Amino acid sequence: MMILEGYGSVLAFFVIASLIPVIALSASKLLRPRGGGPERRTTYESGIEPMGEAWIQFNIRYYMFALVFVVFDVETLFLYPWAVTFQRLGLSAFFEVLIFIIVLLIGLVYAWRKGALEWS
């Protein structure tokens, strides 16, 4: 039990972070206007009449760009705490992060060579 002693604030954070979306969604469901006519079920397109079908198939290139973006966004998520504590971690942590960046760069070069980043 002594190991978990300092984690009360973390537990409180997770409970509050879980309750905020639940409360927001519940409040919006309780306070929303009821009813509505057939106009309410139509697609909203910037205040003008919808043109064409709402269901279209996106080009796969959008997904490839999104995937590459997410990979490098997660890289930033991992690199920021490392950069903040860089002086305390020492040389071994530097080489671990260097290997991490090299692996990501290999993935970027692979995606680039496969044409995943080309838009033509």
Curated annotation (Swiss-Prot):
Gene Ontology molecular function: any one: quinone binding
Reaction it catalyzes: a plastoquinone + NADH + (n+1) H(+)(in) = a plastoquinol + NAD(+) + n H(+)(out); a plastoquinone + NADPH + (n+1) H(+)(in) = a plastoquinol + NADP(+) + n H(+)(out)
GO biological process: photosynthesis, light reaction
Record Pfam families: Oxidored_q4
Sorted UniProt keywords: Chloroplast, Membrane, NAD, NADP, Plastid, Plastoquinone, Quinone, Thylakoid, Translocase, Transmembrane, Transmembrane helix, Transport
UniProt subcellular location: Plastid, Chloroplast thylakoid membrane
This protein's record includes keyword Protein biosynthesis: no
EC number: 7.1.1.-
GO-annotated cellular components: chloroplast thylakoid membrane; NADH dehydrogenase complex
Topological relation to the membrane, as annotated: Multi-pass membrane protein
Segments crossing the lipid bilayer: 3-23, 64-84, 89-109
Family (UniProt): Belongs to the complex I subunit 3 family.
Stated role: NDH shuttles electrons from NAD(P)H:plastoquinone, via FMN and iron-sulfur (Fe-S) centers, to quinones in the photosynthetic chain and possibly in a chloroplast respiratory chain. The immediate electron acceptor for the enzyme in this species is believed to be plastoquinone. Couples the redox reaction to proton translocation, and thus conserves the redox energy in a proton gradient.
Subunit note: NDH is composed of at least 16 different subunits, 5 of which are encoded in the nucleus.
HAMAP family cross-referenced by the UniProt entry: NDH1_NuoA
The protein, known as: NAD(P)H-quinone oxidoreductase subunit 3, chloroplastic
Source species: Nephroselmis olivacea (Green alga)
